[in-house]
């Protein structure tokens, strides 16, 4: 198995104005790295200019950033991965520090943190600022963590993270999925504060504030259900139980006063709603036990991957 020491992964869609500079900057700060540009059906000269700058250019024909990342993670083997967008909004000067945290300090994911520096002043799209803050707050509360930038497109990964990450999303919600995967599996997450700069003039963002924002929030709910089923279904059970109690109180009150059940259909609906609440609660318990089993299997898989990586490194040295 051929394994790169450092692989720089650049997903691109119509980035002809910036991709050449991003590749050159990556080569300058990481001269020993192999730089891969994955072209996602660009209609401009992105692939041509990336190859001219010295990158290995490959194509992903299924549209969407999640699909590109799935292809990259499947095809590239490396001890350390740097993933950066091709829009020149992230400084490559931070890459060596991020690599060091993976290779020397055993980090599984290093987050290029924009939100602790210049993002809110440089970014000219106010709803993006609100969305980033909302997503960060939601995930940190739901998953009891303290990740400073959930949506950043600038990250470093270990081999173990890349080869265990199941890519389920197809679009920009992929960053949220990565963060939750690392948090839920107790992977080591480090942070590097970076200076964010807005896109250069003539370079348009591919992120749709509203539709992609809804997808991200939907992904958070889905992953909370999948990774924290006890919490999710307990909340659902509580809501159903409260609803049943609210509507059954007038029925019970009327029965005490008159000795008759005047709203029999309401009583039946409340009974079924309470049964649904109990089912939701016990479903959460069952799924929580299944999740625990999956965690045990994941740890075994992680150990096997670590041995596989060490064998690959030894082969490279020989």
What is the meaning of each model-derived region?
Residues 14-28:
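Short, well-formed alpha-helical segments that are part of the catalytic scaffolds
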Residues 61-75, 80, 92-172, 176, ...:
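Acceptor/aglycone-binding surface of glycosyltransferases and processive sugar-polymer synthases
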Residues 39-47:
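A conserved acidic beta->alpha catalytic loop
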Residues 3, 32, 76-79:
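Active-site acidic short loop of glycosyltransferases
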Residues 2, 169, 174-318:
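Hydrophobic helical membrane-anchoring modules
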Residues 5-7, 34, 177:
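Cell-envelope/extracellular polymer assembly enzymes that use nucleotide-activated donors
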Residues 15-18, 42, 65, 91:
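Donor nucleotide-sugar binding loop of glycosyltransferases
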């Amino acid at each position: 198995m051929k394994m790169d020491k450092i692989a720089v992964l650049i997903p691109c869609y119509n980035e002809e104005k910036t991709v050449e500079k991003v590749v050159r900057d990556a080569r300058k700060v990481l001269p020993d790295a192999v730089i891969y540009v994955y072209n996602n059906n660009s209609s401009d000269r992105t692939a041509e200019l990336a190859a001219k700058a010295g990158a290995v250019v490959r194509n992903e024909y299924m549209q969407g950033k999640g699909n590109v990342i799935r292809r990259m993670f499947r095809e590239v083997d490396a001890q350390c991965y740097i993933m950066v967008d091709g829009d020149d909004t992230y400084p490559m000067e931070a890459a060596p520090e991020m690599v060091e945290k993976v290779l020397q300090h055993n980090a599984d994911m290093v987050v290029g943190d924009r939100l602790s520096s210049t993002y809110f002043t440089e970014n000219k799209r106010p709803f993006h600022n609100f969305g980033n803050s909302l997503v960060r707050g939601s995930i940190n509360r739901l998953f009891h963590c303290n990740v400073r930038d959930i949506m950043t497109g600038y990250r470093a990964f270990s081999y173990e993270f890349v080869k265990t990450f199941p890519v389920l999303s197809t679009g920009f919600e992929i960053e949220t999925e990565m963060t939750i995967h690392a948090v839920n599996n107790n992977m080591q997450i480090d942070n590097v504060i970076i200076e964010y700069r807005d896109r250069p003039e003539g370079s348009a963002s591919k992120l749709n504030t509203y539709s992609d924002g809804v997808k991200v929030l939907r992904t958070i709910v889905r992953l909370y259900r999948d990774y924290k089923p006890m919490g999710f279904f307990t909340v659902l059970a509580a809501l159903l139980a409260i609803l049943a109690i609210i509507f059954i109180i007038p029925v019970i009150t009327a029965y005490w006063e008159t000795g008759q059940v005047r709203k029999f259909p309401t009583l039946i609906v409340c009974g079924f709603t309470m049964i649904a609440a109990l089912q939701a609660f016990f479903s959460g318990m069952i799924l929580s036990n299944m999740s625990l089993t999956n965690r045990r299997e994941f740890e075994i898989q992680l150990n096997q991957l670590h041995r596989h990586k060490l064998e690959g490194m030894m082969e490279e040295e020989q």
